[in-house]
Amino acid sequence: MRRTTFVGLVPLLLLLVTGEATAHAFLDHAEPRVGNKVDAAPREVTLWFTQKLEPAFSTIAVTNAAGQRIDTGKARVSGNQMSVSVRPGGTGTYRVNWHVLSVDTHTTDGDFTFQVGQ
């Protein structure tokens, strides 16, 4: 009876372990928040992901309403967090584009917008 119980648990344990190992880094939340309206342009955009990131292969680009890139350069990555400094870009819709490589070697990307001063 004990052998049957153990054999029955093995597939369940494998499913749990491989489910975590194959997870990708998806956007968990951001500051400024996705779709939010803020009074003034932020000095920094920060994204948090569901997995740790590989710094050398993870990027953020921030553009203002005129489509001009206003981030100041390379993203800073620490664990599952990525941020970039932003120059003032006026009012309107800002777009954040991101591309990340998680430590599980899978890439994900996406974008979102937020409003400044409208």
Q: Which residue ranges define each predicted feature?
A:
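Short, surface-exposed alpha-helix to beta-strand junction/turn motifs within ectodomains of secreted
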Residues: 45-47, 51-70
